[in-house]
Every structure is written in C-alpha cells, then in structure tokens.
Amino acid sequence: MKFTLVGNGRMGHEVASVIDASTVHSIAAVLDIDAVITPEVFRGSDAIIDFTVRDAFLENLDAMLASGVPVVTGTTGWDGLREEVAVKVSEAGASLLYSANFSLGVNVFLRTLREASRLIAPFAQFDIAMEEHHHTGKVDFPSGTALAAANVILSANSRKQRIVRELPEAGRLAPDDLQVASVRLGSVFGKHSAFIDSEADEIVLSHTAKSRSGFASGAVEAAVWLAGRHPKQPGMYSMDDFLNELLG
C-alpha cells in the first residue's frame, strides 16, 4: 500500500519509520505545515494517515475527504465537533477512522476498563477515578486517551455522570463526578491509570507506553483495514470497529 502522511512531527516520523521498515508498504508523500492541501495531492495513495493538530486537521478535512482516499487520524482536540465531522464524512461518501490512541495495548486496556466499570457498577462501596501522565510538551489535557477512558467508564457505570477535570476550589466532588487528573512530567510517553477504591480493596488498571512505535504500528494496521473496506463500506469508524472485526 501507498500512504500519504499529513504531519511531519514526532508521530509522523514514527509512522514513516514503520512504513519504511515494511516490505509491502511505501510512502507516496509527506505533507508538512507548509504544504498546500488539495484533494489532488492525495490521489494515487491508498490511505492517508494524519497526525497534526486540531486546527490543521479541521482545515484539511474537506480536501482529504474529497480525495476519495480513506483517512486515518490520530489528531485530538476536536471531540466536540464529532457529529459535524461525521456529517461531512457521510456527505462525501468517505471513510475516516479516528482514535486518540492506536496502541493495541491501550485498546486492550480500554476494553478491560469497560468490563471492570460494569462489574463494580452495582456496588456503591467502589469508587473510580482516572489519572494520566504525559511529557511536558503535550498541549491538551486531559489527553484524548484519558477522555476516551472516562467515556468508557461513564457508559458502563451509571453511578458516574460527568467528567471533572479540576478539583473544586471549595467543597468536594459529588458522588457522581468522575475525576480525570492530569500530570505533565519530563519525557513520559503516556501512562493512563484507573483507580477503583473501597474501604477493603484497591484495584489499579494501568497502561504505560514505552515508545511511540506502538501508536504508529497500530495506525498503519488500522489504515490497511480501512482501505480494505473502502469504498464499498464508507463511514466513520473507531478502533473498536477495527478490533471487533479482528476478534469476531
């Protein structure tokens, strides 16, 4: 397969390294911040992999969708516009797969967290909270992966109703608040932990990224999967869709 990479930052370089090491894939083009993005620049590629920033992704979206080439993006920060993006994807008859984290390990963590959240839901003695650690260069907080994990908890445990990113200046958290704490420290690639606590027990579920290679490999695998579905099955997809098909 031939890939066009949008974004030439750390993740873009990591994805390029994964593709370069492959015997079956190649890079058609790498588009950096100075590139003029039109539908034509993507034609001849089998898939687009985008790792940019929120504003660049939204600015380039129409051209990527109009190209007819399936798009995989790991750019975060636009969750509040998900419905609008889904409408654009549908109107263009395009295929787009979005994930805040393409690491297969993280997605195993999220599935484990979903089951744990469901299991503790009937038992009021168990409380749950999230914490994420990333390097000091990461701009958004909580991370997209932490928000995905928090939404997994909310969907599986009705005792939690809302995400709280900061502690209140006075008073304390309500019982149905889900705290998502963020730490920015050194060069940490990414660590996400869920803490389940009661008077008698503590359960900790955690995933630590050792390098960016897991994110990059997962993005390439997801792009291969998406290209295999397009154009017969266009639409907006997630890593859950990818994994569900693999796992049956």
From Swiss-Prot:
One of its GO terms (cellular component) is cytosol. It is found in: Cytoplasm. Its main location: cytoplasm. Gene3D superfamilies: Dihydrodipicolinate Reductase, domain 2 (3.30.360.10), NAD(P)-binding Rossmann-like Domain (3.40.50.720). Keywords: Amino-acid biosynthesis, Cytoplasm, Diaminopimelate biosynthesis, Lysine biosynthesis, NAD, NADP, Oxidoreductase. Pathway: Amino-acid biosynthesis; L-lysine biosynthesis via DAP pathway; (S)-tetrahydrodipicolinate from L-aspartate: step 4/4. InterPro entries: DapB_C (IPR022663), DapB_N (IPR000846), DHDPR_bac (IPR023940), NAD(P)-bd_dom_sf (IPR036291). (S)-2,3,4,5-tetrahydrodipicolinate binds at residues 135, 144-145. It comes from the Bacteria. NAD(+) binds at residues 32, 74-76, 99-102. GO terms for biological process: diaminopimelate biosynthetic process; lysine biosynthetic process via diaminopimelate. The active site is at 134 (proton donor/acceptor), 138 (proton donor). The keyword Metal-binding does not apply. It is an enzyme of class 1 (oxidoreductase). The keyword Amino-acid biosynthesis applies. One of its GO terms (molecular function) is 4-hydroxy-tetrahydrodipicolinate reductase. Its EC number is 1.17.1.8. It catalyses: (S)-2,3,4,5-tetrahydrodipicolinate + NAD(+) + H2O = (2S,4S)-4-hydroxy-2,3,4,5-tetrahydrodipicolinate + NADH + H(+); (S)-2,3,4,5-tetrahydrodipicolinate + NADP(+) + H2O = (2S,4S)-4-hydroxy-2,3,4,5-tetrahydrodipicolinate + NADPH + H(+). HAMAP family: DapB (MF_00102). Belongs to the DapB family. Catalyzes the conversion of 4-hydroxy-tetrahydrodipicolinate (HTPA) to tetrahydrodipicolinate. This is 4-hydroxy-tetrahydrodipicolinate reductase. It comes from Chlorobium phaeovibrioides (strain DSM 265 / 1930) (Prosthecochloris vibrioformis (strain DSM 265)).
